[in-house]
């Protein structure tokens, strides 16, 4: 079928300089929200106080995956926060620097599922990633950051996207970048916020595009997209966690590799999915086969994007595609 929304703006360059200091009024400079393609500066002054010498976390140094998952389950008790320590530099996992303790044995699915409250229906798509030594390294780094900084969303919401629909119920996949970095917003679904939180700018543009496609769609005024998730829309960020007040701060600890593996298995298992890829990040991170799936591309819904997102017809095109395959369309009301 023809893709009505394949136009994409020129790629944005991610700034290589350190994060800019926000104005005194606390407003991040040129930043709409945490899901926008160009990460902005933190508008929260707190950073972490690191215990000890800042070396490898105890779980990573001890008895391997079992101790690592036990440490994650125990949680960051007694962690304090101050504004004295500098932010962590990005971590690059491409150098193969995985500790021997982290690679001693595959991670156990049952424990992993219990720690993160993952729905067991996702086991065939996620368990193969646990055999990859880089996943142990990822979780060790996640655990270390939980001990030294405030990580969003809460651990019980990192994989909440697995609890709304099973892999066999997914009809549409919408790819985001990383969670919102202000407290009370992120809850594990890309672009979505909790029901008591006003929609951030990018999400407002998404909902406006829905209204343009379906004027009769009901909009409740909040930005919680759980209804979409229960209806078979997988709202998945390529990075599942973030440091409070620091957009893209966890973008290089390895979540993208983990999420990419899950998406590849889902795409192989479920031909005929609709993928909505908004912005160059999503389009470069996830590349489904357009001969097998309906792949829709458009600019990011950020107010900073060159192409206004309100003209995007993805929600209409997605339903038409599903109907051609005798699949029930999505009710995009919120």
From Swiss-Prot:
InterPro entries: UDG_fam1 (IPR002043), Ura-DNA_Glyclase_AS (IPR018085), Uracil-DNA_glycosylase-like (IPR005122), Uracil-DNA_glycosylase-like_sf (IPR036895). Residues 1-63, 79-104 are annotated as: Disordered. It is found in: Host nucleus. It catalyses: Hydrolyzes single-stranded DNA or mismatched double-stranded DNA and polynucleotides, releasing free uracil. GO terms for biological process: base-excision repair, AP site formation via deaminated base removal. One of its GO terms (molecular function) is uracil DNA N-glycosylase activity. It is an enzyme of class 3 (hydrolase). Changing residue 280 to A: In strain: Nonneuroinvasive mutant HF10. Changing residue 53 to L: In strain: Nonneuroinvasive mutant HF10. Residues 40-50 have a biased composition (Polar residues). Changing residue 38 to I: In strain: Nonneuroinvasive mutant HF10. Keywords: DNA damage, DNA repair, Host nucleus, Hydrolase. The active site is at 178 (proton acceptor). HAMAP family: UDG. NCBIfam families: PRK05254.1-2 (NF003589), PRK05254.1-5 (NF003592), ung (TIGR00628). Belongs to the uracil-DNA glycosylase (UDG) superfamily. UNG family. This is Uracil-DNA glycosylase. It comes from Human herpesvirus 1 (strain 17). The lineage of its organism: Viruses, Duplodnaviria, Heunggongvirae, Peploviricota, Herviviricetes.
